[in-house]
A protein has these predicted regions:
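Carbohydrate-active catalytic/glycan-binding domains of CAZyme proteins
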Residues: 1-205
Length: 205
């Protein structure tokens, strides 16, 4: 896992955070917590920490530069099933994490949990977080696409909402996510919640 940083968003430097040859890393997400920073890390190796791939582990840092994993056997979510694509945020003593669940019939949907200690997790009352449907295919700027491209989008199989990321902008929550067939034909989409990020995440509980 590498990190990148810049003082001017023009000139960038890089540093390797984790170099573990026997591990397999995938999606990551970082937030500021109650005592430093937390990184959620998706893995599928080593097997003893993964269980059933994929699984999310957690690392901590005081300065964003130097990281160490929390105990993988105690601080993970969740070795008993597919849990991938983490996005983590922190509000009012709780870590909120959106992640991907594998459903029957090749469907993938994001769920949300929260935790005070990254060991014991509470499942949100309103899950899945999102569900794939035809509104994912709505095009904000159709004039930017050809007729064939619009048909390609409209005819695509959609069984997946995944890789969620989100931020707060001008008092609203902006959500970026992927939709498609989870087999390589994927598209990016945008959603919006009329409220702050904290209000949005807390509303699931």
């Amino acid at each position: 896992i590498d990190m990148f940083w810049s003082e001017d968003l023009i000139n960038w430097r890089t540093k390797t955070v984790f170099d573990l040859p026997d591990w397999a890393f995938f999606n990551t997400s970082v937030c500021k917590g109650h005592d430093g920073y937390i990184m959620a890390v998706e893995i599928n190796k080593p097997a003893e920490y993964t269980g059933k791939a994929f699984t999310i582990l957690f690392a901590k840092s005081k300065d964003l530069f130097n990281w160490e994993f929390l105990s993988p056997m105690e601080h993970s979510y969740s070795r008993d099933r597919y849990t991938a694509c983490p996005t983590i945020r922190f509000f009012n003593g709780q870590y909120y994490m959106i992640y991907l669940e594998a459903m029957p019939l090749h469907r993938y949907m994001p769920y949300i949990v929260r935790s005070k200690d990254l060991e014991h997790f509470e499942l949100g009352m309103l899950n899945p977080f999102m569900t794939p449907d035809n509104t994912d295919k709505l095009v904000i700027t159709p004039d930017c696409f050809t007729k064939d491209e619009l048909e390609y989008i409209n005819s695509a199989v959609n069984c997946n909402n995944s890789d969620v990321d989100l931020c707060e902008y001008k008092g609203k929550t902006v959500i970026l996510y992927s939709w498609g067939n989870q087999l390589g034909k994927e598209f990016l989409a945008l959603a919006e919640y009329d409220g702050t990020l904290q209000e949005f995440l807390e509303s699931f509980f």
